[in-house]
Amino acid sequence: MVILGIDPGYALLGYGIVETDTVNSKAIDYGVIETNVGEPFPERLERLYLGMRQLIELYKPDKIAFEELFFAKNTKTALLVGAARGVAILAAQRCSKPLYEYTPM
């Protein structure tokens, strides 16, 4: 089974690909989808969407796991990350694979 894990962000969206069976797990790939600070926000969201689609097409995950948002201080940042997370969830949903959400704790 191949699992794609996502740590949402709008500047950097982290990902990890793990292959697992009933006994062993192995890291296949990890990294970030990076957006340019100088780009308009809609273009940054598009870059995240296309990057997610590329990961999904390349690794064909069986399941996709998202870290839930955990913010207490900066409302603006939470809204921007929430938008990026929504775009990533949309990209994942389009591949018709099960989506799971986990807290960062």
Regions found by a protein language model. Give the residues of each.
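Phosphate- and other anionic-substrate recognition elements at nucleic-acid/protein interfaces
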Residues: 1-105
